[in-house]
Amino acid sequence: MAKTDLLEVQGTILEVLPNTMFKVQLKNGATILAHVSGKIRMNYIRILPGDTVVVEMSPYDLERGRIVFRHK
């Protein structure tokens, strides 16, 4: 799948789960499971409950996503 097919949405971290998984509440009210992208993992960026993040989602699975950016 091309990168242009991904949906980028903003959300807030609700809960930190094991194995670098997070529950994220999106702006539209939906709650999804998201994991951390490799760049965030490589740079040791901490993600805590309450943080605002940008999540990339596939149009084929709207229940899961990848966290690509954490707002300060």
UniProtKB/Swiss-Prot annotation:
Cell compartment(s), UniProt: Cytoplasm
Family stated for the protein in its record: Belongs to the IF-1 family.
Stated name of the protein: Translation initiation factor IF-1
Keyword line: Cytoplasm, Initiation factor, Protein biosynthesis, RNA-binding, rRNA-binding
Function: One of the essential components for the initiation of protein synthesis. Stabilizes the binding of IF-2 and IF-3 on the 30S subunit to which N-formylmethionyl-tRNA(fMet) subsequently binds. Helps modulate mRNA selection, yielding the 30S pre-initiation complex (PIC). Upon addition of the 50S ribosomal subunit IF-1, IF-2 and IF-3 are released leaving the mature 70S translation initiation complex.
NCBIfam families: infA
Major place of residence: cytoplasm
Residue ranges constituting the S1-like domain according to the UniProt record: 1-72
InterPro entries on file: NA-bd_OB-fold, RNA-binding_domain_S1_IF1, S1_domain, TIF_IF1
Quaternary structure (record): Component of the 30S ribosomal translation pre-initiation complex which assembles on the 30S ribosome in the order IF-2 and IF-3, IF-1 and N-formylmethionyl-tRNA(fMet); mRNA recruitment can occur at any time during PIC assembly.
Alphabetized Gene3D superfamilies for the sequence: Nucleic acid-binding proteins
Cellular component GO terms held in the UniProt record: cytosol
GO MF term set: ribosome binding; rRNA binding; translation initiation factor activity
